[in-house]
A protein has these predicted regions:
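Non-catalytic cap/lid and distal C-terminal segments of serine-dependent acyl enzymes
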Residues: 1-210
Length: 210
């Protein structure tokens, strides 16, 4: 939810960047309980259509309203399933976003949809559509000009994120897309405590990255 970052002190660890005028943070509410995490009430097609409505709202309504000037840089970021959303927005619309920072994410749609696949699910599964994207696709050139950072630990709860991050690492490398996949140690678990360490570390580097 949109308040998770404040409740878990992510805003607090980013305060030095915010107070220095280097960073503005916009947290967006999700509807994951109705879509990706909804195992009981809706069929898969209804869930992905609902998700797509939310996605289009962010792209078509929210983003234009928060953009203060055409030169403003936007980077998507998130941890855990927020990392999936960050990657999904960025890789679907690199024309709108300047980069991405994804912590401990899983980047394929099977997380919420199991074996079900249709065109809309595919469009929301970065690991799938990037694998099949032709190297001459115009987005590939855009990716090469963007800031792409993945990080995952290798401790408790990070196994699926580790496998998925390694797969994204492989796909991007095969397409000669510059990126940084940082693998932290086996003492780094799937938890806010570690994301509070990672977030300012990477944000500082991204803001200095030219």
């Amino acid at each position: 939810r949109f308040y998770d970052w404040e409740d878990n002190k992510m805003i607090e660890v980013l305060a030095p960047f915010i107070n220095a005028g280097r960073l503005r943070v916009i947290t967006i509410d999700s509807i994951d309980s109705e879509t990706w995490s909804n195992k009981d009430y809706w069929d898969n097609r209804t869930k992905i259509e609902r998700h797509e409505c939310w996605y289009q709202y962010i792209i078509e309504e929210l983003l234009p309203n928060v953009r203060q000037n055409p030169e403003q840089m936007f980077i998507t970021t998130g941890a855990s399933f927020g990392a999936f959303h960050a990657a999904n927005f960025f890789f679907r619309r690199p024309d709108l976003f300047n980069g991405m920072l994804a912590l401990s994410g899983i980047y394929y749609a099977a997380y919420g949809f199991g074996d079900y696949m249709d065109g809309l699910v595919y469009e929301n599964s970065p690991q799938n559509f990037l694998q099949n994207m032709p190297k001459e696709h115009p987005y590939v050139d855009m990716y090469r000009q963007r800031k792409i950072v993945f990080c995952t630990g290798q401790g408790i709860g990070e196994q699926e994120a580790l496998v998925s991050t390694r797969e994204m690492d492989r796909i991007l490398s095969e397409k000669a897309i510059p990126h940084w996949c940082d693998y932290w140690g086996s003492d780094i678990n799937h938890d806010w405590h570690f994301w509070r360490r990672q977030m300012p570390y990477f944000i500082d580097k991204i803001l200095m990255w030219r």
